Amino acid sequence: MNDQKVVLDKGPFFHGTKAALKLGELLEPQHMSNYQDKRSNHIYFTATLDAAKWGAELAASQAQERIYIVEPLGEFENDPNLTDKRFPGNPTRSYRSQSPLKVVAELASWERHSDDAINQMLASLAKLREQGTAAIED
């Protein structure tokens, strides 16, 4: 019998947000979603800097955009909102967990997407909301 656990990804892992967090702080589910008007049952994170940038840039707030390096403290799964959607598999290496993430560092500097790209993404998300198809599988 093989009791070896399959690890989806070894990281490093990132969480993009506009929340000011302290090192060692835990990110937990049941906070208001940045993308829906409800509490989220999961905490979302990624192993790609590009996806973390989108998380920070699209978060619902006027606060400073931040990207944290995080450590999952429990099991996690592929984010079903992105996995096998536009592309097969999980090329954005996006995950979600019902267990906390521990903040281990903050990226001091990173290059944002262009304002045009961010505005296009915001317009696309607004269109999905208008069409009623922006629901997140949570």
Short names for language-model regions:
Residues M1-I43, E57-L58, E65:
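ADP-ribose/NAD+-binding catalytic cleft of ART/PARP-like enzymes
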Residues L49-A63:
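Short active-site loop/helix that positions an aromatic residue
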Residues K18, E25-L26, A63-D138:
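Active-site and NAD+-binding cores of ADP-ribose-processing enzymes
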Residues N2, A56-E57, E106-E111:
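Short amphipathic beta-strand and strand-loop transition segments with alternating hydrophobic
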